[in-house]
């Protein structure tokens, strides 16, 4: 007989009918328990408790618990957290809330420890609570997980796992799912009670979907917390999370940005990696404070109307002995073959995305940051290195996929799974891919074959336009297409225009140093470029310091040159970026159709004069915007350009304004169109284009 009443196991609907099942398990809010035995016909009888050692999927896809003739050893102590259903999910590698089971969990009078080490001969917990002598852990069924509950251990305790591998060798490891860690170079994990934080961001959480929408203005301030500002009167230390909650949040709000993007804060041993070589994916770095203070930072940002994105690194991990490498004596998280598992550029190890438990470890980590820390999105690092098996490898140094190709099919599948899980859990967040190739469909839905990201960095736009701006203006006429061609692929993805930390390090120079000419021309070039960038379709991202034209490259060992920011020329660029943000946010035509081709139209392009003009459009009834850029140091007087609509056009921004450090040449606040055909339009306006400038006009209401 069939049963018409299915029940839910997470997002999968499972029928109560299976002829092969000895027991079917349902997930409840409190625990997971057998619902009842099945009659020979498949119907439910009274509830019957069974000893469960394993799980399988029945022939029709039903979740089945298998009964054994003898009960398993009593390996689970009273008060342990791992339920039968947890065991099933752990065994299958599909536990989306992995952090609620593994790691160190503070209870009333004890701490429960659990770690996945399936190939270990034995595992112990060693810490400052047992004289670092080791407390034996017990295996949990067939899951590969070991656990123990230790009375008297609480928040702040130091611990490591002592893992005896199959050959009898002893390894000391930090907790892969630890919520805290010692300050590097110390390597122990730290018990952190992350329960019960008093969030005050309910209003933000209810409406944040609007801030992530493709039609919303998104302007992101990328930050390296350790070097944004330092306390030089206190030994040169970086700001704490709590101090950043006041100083950083206040500054970003004042500057008109919509989001803060934090470079990686998952615990990492080497400062020089900037966080891109993490060992503690579940632990906010202690460099700036404990976990609850990181929550204070996020809570403060939300109170200020700012979203918080985290730079997330699922592509690789370092070889540090206390980390994930050969965790239980085997290549547990990484590939055994270095042609698949070793990243030659960074001397790091690559996750084995073909292993279900490893995928689950990473997917659960993405969900963890959203759920436990209320983050509003993830920027996924180095996606290109994940997508291709031959990435940065010579011939013969990589292993083809099962079809003989170069694509990393397992990584592609993992990224799709991650995006489906993240958006499935909370559609109000965003995921962003740093992807530098032409891999198709990065920000397209998974069900259409895409990777499922919300947005993708437009690395091509960044490379082309910065290359153009570095040229002496006399040569720009021969490279005009570098400023115009990017629009040809602008709508193939949901793009963010990025000026990131990678562009101001390793000898590339600061944004100001990239610009040609004398000091005045450098600043004018940069102002014109920022005007072009903010008016161009696509969401915006800029790295800290670039907003005030920091004179030199960024260094993680110091902080930003705030002295320069106080000088008039640099303060002018800072004021420009603030005004660009507010204009972008307040003008629907500049953001509503960032990702739609009918929101943009070319008006004029003159390579010989290095000028270009375009229009931006919003929804019906939104005032259109016209943008004109002059990338030569020559003033253009009585410059005529077509406009899409007759009427009075306000000059809402001019990068040559005196307030920004310019020469204050312009159009006296606005122009009136004339019935003189130009550039294919029946109406046109006559403009003064200052040298090295961007002028923005908006149709007067």
Swiss-Prot record:
Catalyzed reaction equations: Transfers a segment of a (1->4)-alpha-D-glucan chain to a primary hydroxy group in a similar glucan chain
Name of this protein: 1,4-alpha-glucan branching enzyme GlgB
InterPro entries per the UniProt record, alphabetical: A-amylase/branching_C, Branching_enzy, GlgB, GlgB_N_E_set_prok, Glyco_hydro_13_cat_dom, Glyco_hydro_13_N, Glyco_hydro_b, Glycoside_hydrolase_SF
Single Gene Ontology MF annotation: cation binding
Entry EC number(s): 2.4.1.18
Record-linked SUPFAM superfamilies: (Trans)glycosidases, E set domains, Glycosyl hydrolase domain
Family: Belongs to the glycosyl hydrolase 13 family. GlgB subfamily.
Annotated pathway: Glycan biosynthesis; glycogen biosynthesis
NCBIfam families: branching_enzym (TIGR01515), PRK05402.1 (NF003811), PRK12313.1 (NF008967)
Oligomeric and partner information: Monomer.
GO terms under biological process: glycogen biosynthetic process
Residues forming the catalytic site: 381 (nucleophile), 434 (proton donor)
Any Pfam family the entry gives: CBM_48
Enzyme class: transferase
Keywords on record: Carbohydrate metabolism, Glycogen biosynthesis, Glycogen metabolism, Glycosyltransferase, Transferase
GO cellular component terms listed in the entry, alphabetical order: cytosol
Role played: Catalyzes the formation of the alpha-1,6-glucosidic linkages in glycogen by scission of a 1,4-alpha-linked oligosaccharide from growing alpha-1,4-glucan chains and the subsequent attachment of the oligosaccharide to the alpha-1,6 position.
